[in-house]
Amino acid sequence: MSDINATRLPHPFPLGLQPCAGDVDNLTLTKGEG
């Protein structure tokens, strides 16, 4: 998971409580690049 996206974009879940790091990372990538 990219810390840059985590720091730049708001996360729906606190770090460590994410249901799936892969899903959250995909969402951040979509929002950041889209």
UniProtKB/Swiss-Prot annotation:
Alphabetically, the GO molecular function entries are: toxin activity
Claim: S-adenosyl-L-methionine is one of the keywords in the record: no
Coiled-coil portions: none
Concerning PTM, the database record says: Processed by the macrocyclase-peptidase enzyme POPB to yield a toxic cyclic nonapeptide. POPB first removes 10 residues from the N-terminus. Conformational trapping of the remaining peptide forces the enzyme to release this intermediate rather than proceed to macrocyclization. The enzyme rebinds the remaining peptide in a different conformation and catalyzes macrocyclization of the N-terminal 9 residues.
Keyword Acetylation listed? The answer is: no
Q: Please tell me which positions the record assigns to the cross-link Cyclopeptide (His-Pro).
A: 11-19
Q: Give the highest taxon in the source lineage.
A: Eukaryota
Q: Which residues form the propeptide?
A: 1-10, 20-34
Key words, A-Z: Toxin
- According to its UniProt record, which protein family does this protein belong to? Belongs to the MSDIN fungal toxin family.
Known role: Probable toxin that belongs to the MSDIN-like toxin family responsible for a large number of food poisoning cases and deaths.
Protein name in UniProt: MSDIN-like toxin proprotein 12
